[in-house]
Amino acid sequence: VLPLSQCTDLNLVGGKAIGLARLITADFSAPQGFCITTEAYTQSLHASGFIEHEEWQKAYALSGNERASALADCRIRIGRIETSQLAAHCLTALQGLHQPPNTRWAVRSSATNEDMAHTSFAGLYRTHLCVALFDIDAALKDLWASLWEERVVSYQVRQSSHTAPRMAVVVQPMIEAQSAGVAYSIHPVT
């Protein structure tokens, strides 16, 4: 678990966390937060016997209903992963942000292949907004599981990428915004 301001390694924190770190270190107004690293993702999966690069290659090689079934099984297994030790680290990081106990949180994907020059993955991974403190662990697992959706694998196939992506997760306090938005200069999927 790293503070957003210390997120500099793409392979460890993903594209979104790097972008947020750049904003924070350049003194733009962005909520402070932290990143649950790809290392935490990999260690948590491996501790449960889930070897992501092997499972990815299996799913990547399949198609149709066979792929859908394999991916569904992966998502179920990820949802059952034991994360109590990681949750304790997250709680410490949350307390370090000095937010009131009733704060709601944004739990956001930051995959290693997300928000890059040649790949967007816009809208393919999940985001959870207004998450209560004790629901962050479930949101984390759901974001990890969103790597294992058919639409993600299909996009990877179209990009000719055979490598299993890894997911970091950004956690930030929700803010009262007057407006928000995203602008695309090219189509986010094709």
Where do the model's predicted regions map?
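Short beta-strand elements
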Residues: 126-130, 173, 182-190
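N-terminal beta-alpha lobe that positions the nucleotide/phosphoryl donor
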Residues: 1-170, 179
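Conserved, single-site charged/polar hotspot
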Residues: 176
